[in-house]
């Protein structure tokens, strides 16, 4: 993290996290001012390469170019998500904005990993993007285990019923809450907000962005390009200890139309 982001993040935490890791009122004026400070500070930072994320990667566990149906042939769509492949990208949306949808990577990843993907907004009017990770059944079953309840994109099926996971909303621009001022990390089941940081992908941005998600033991971070928006250590006070190995999924709400490419996941070295 660069100096400007470090200082701004410190201000944000001081104002909003004195006793808990949650904002009591993220939409008040001081919070909005702090978010602006953090966004400005992030823009001053020097660009970072993957080696600059203060973590050592080991093996490349999985990669998909996401540029053809063959490149995602083992992925599983839940809900009415529609895919289109063009110009080296995978577009994902719900026809007629029918319903939310979740797209599961087929691999189960270890507790400690770094994942990266690129994405670009194709519909600036509205949308919401989430990443689920460390996802399993409540008894650590594979999320695709046939004994688990069927899922079709309804949110409660992922955060309140039969699964445990973390999820981060890193682009949030819904009709009821346009240009939401924070990114959120929740620990499930229970939709427990455990951390709120500065906004993720700018709602007015139509350029491509690189998302980097790092889970190093109990430490969870998420970057949009070189900008740190989530930085939290799971102390086990919510839903028990840190979650372990599990699957990753990309979720979009019904209004969302993004395109994706170059999804990669690395393991981390033991000396992180």
Predicted segments, located by residue:
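Extracellular carbohydrate-recognition regions
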Residues: 49-77
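Bacterial N-terminal signal peptides
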Residues: 34-43
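Secretory/extracellular carbohydrate-interaction modules
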Residues: 96-183
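Short carbohydrate-recognition loop motifs
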Residues: 82-99
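Flexible glycan-contacting loops in extracellular carbohydrate-active proteins
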Residues: 233-261
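Short, aromatic/His-centered strand-loop micro-motif at the edge of beta-sheets
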Residues: 186-210
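Short tryptophan-centered beta-strand motifs in secreted/extracellular beta-sheet-rich domains
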Residues: 66, 115-117, 207-216, 220-222
């Amino acid at each position: 993290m660069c100096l400007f982001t470090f200082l701004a993040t410190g201000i944000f935490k001081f104002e909003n996290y004195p006793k808990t890791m949650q904002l009591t009122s993220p939409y008040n004026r001081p919070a909005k001012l702090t978010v602006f400070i953090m966004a400005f500070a992030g823009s001053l930072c020097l660009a970072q390469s993957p080696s600059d994320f203060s973590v050592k990667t080991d093996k490349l566990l999985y990669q998909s170019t996401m540029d053809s149906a063959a490149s995602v042939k083992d992925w599983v769509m839940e809900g009415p998500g529609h895919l289109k492949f063009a110009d080296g990208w995978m577009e994902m949306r719900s026809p007629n904005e029918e319903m939310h949808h979740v797209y599961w990577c087929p691999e189960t990843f270890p507790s400690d990993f770094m994942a990266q993907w690129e994405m670009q907004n194709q519909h600036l009017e509205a949308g919401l993007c989430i990443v689920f990770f460390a996802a399993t059944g409540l008894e650590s079953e594979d999320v695709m285990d046939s004994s688990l309840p069927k899922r079709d994109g309804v949110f409660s099926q992922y955060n309140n019923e039969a699964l445990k996971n973390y999820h981060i909303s890193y682009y949030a621009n819904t009709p009821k809450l346009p240009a939401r001022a924070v990114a959120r990390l929740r620990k499930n089941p229970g939709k427990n907000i455990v951390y709120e940081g500065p906004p993720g992908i700018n709602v007015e941005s139509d350029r491509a962005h690189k998302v980097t998600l790092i889970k190093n033991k109990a430490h969870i971070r998420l970057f949009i390009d070189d900008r740190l928006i989530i930085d939290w250590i799971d102390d086990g006070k919510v839903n028990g200890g840190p979650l372990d190995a599990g699957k990753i999924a990309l979720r979009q709400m019904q209004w969302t139309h993004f395109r994706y490419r170059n999804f990669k996941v690395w393991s981390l070295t033991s000396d992180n």
